[in-house]
Amino acid sequence: MKENSKEERGRLHGMVWSSSAFFSFMWRHFVHDRVLMSAGSLAFQTLLSLVPLMAVTLSILKVFPVFASLKQYIGDFLFQNFAPAQGSILKGYLWEFIDKTSSLSTVGGLFLIVIVLFLISTIDQTLNDIWEVQTPRRRLQGFTLYWTVLTLGPVFIGTSVLASSYVWYSVFAEGALLEMKARVLSYVPVLNSVIAFFLLYMLVPNRKVRFTHALAGGVLAAVLFELAKRWFTFYVSSFATFEHIYGALSVVPMLFFWIYLEWVVVLTGAEFVFSLGYFRPAVCPAREFDPLQGVPEVVAVLRSVWRAQLSGSFMTGKKLLASENSGDRSKLGHVVDFLKQNGILHKTADGGLAISADLHAVTLYDLYTKLPRELFNGDGCVDEGPASREFEPLRAEVREALRSAMQTPLITLVNDSTEKDS
């Protein structure tokens, strides 16, 4: 019984330690990618693109007669997601603006489409920055993706609203257990959000994303999205700060604040999906101290860039992620930034990486003394990856040297300090 209890405690401790390491890794990337700043930039661009986006969406849906009678429902669907607590004032303004776009000329209509495409392009670039994609999509491939999103996105929204309406009138509108059926139907928007976020995380990054990771990120983002909607509605109804300060103009900052929250949720889900794919916990059963934290990863990146340079080509971030010899992939972005900041690597005109320093003149000690410790395993555990194992002999020597140099009893240090103070 005691052995089983110890095993359970050990397993629980391992799960807690691994979860803590995962969220610590996710938080480091969250800060490194400046998610809050990126969300603000996207929120501002979305605010400027909101009317063109809704106008283009409704215009595309007009092409399909089946969606013609659902204009009001589709508009309400978009308002619930872009402005859940703004009331009829904002709806009135936006419907007025959208109706005016119908009288635009062909050039004006094309300009609206260009604005929306720029927004989609910014979203694509921001998400790919999270996945540390150094090489952008080819122009034809990128245009095809953006145009597909622009044309099929509204169809997806219309289909969701149409399916919800059909299910409501055919199954839920009458019959027994009407209250329970209505409650079940209330979860349909959450399901739509899960699907939308899943497709966003699965298709937009120019990386291979696992199905389960994208689905988990979609679920997390959908839950956070619903919580954000409820909190924002409560905030606006209970604390009328914006209305008190801005008066009739309060609808603009409130709308901007809500769109900002939306993008924070979207990018947080993206960071979660990225972390699921690239986090690798250090194996540390005995919690043995590693005096060479970060060295294997830095040397592995340098080796990959050097070998590519010798072969007449340049290493890219995408190739580094795909390489099995580049060390812990979760740290690649930090390693490359560190090497560039210290003048050892530089970025070429076409986005590749090249050696800047004379590697004959730079020693391992020079590199070691400049390593930013906070970017690596803060717990001091040994990473047992292939790039780390080759440093085991050197690691043992350094550990032994430290052990020999630090055999001084603490009482000696305390007494020396006391004597000097007196």
Swiss-Prot record:
It is a multi-pass membrane protein. The chain crosses the membrane at residues 12-31, 47-67, 103-123, 143-163, 184-204, 214-234, 247-267. Pfam families: Virul_fac_BrkB. It is found in: Cell inner membrane. It comes from the Bacteria. Keywords: Cell inner membrane, Cell membrane, Membrane, Transmembrane, Transmembrane helix. PANTHER family: INNER MEMBRANE PROTEIN YHJD, UPF0761 MEMBRANE PROTEIN YIHY. This is UPF0761 membrane protein CT1325.
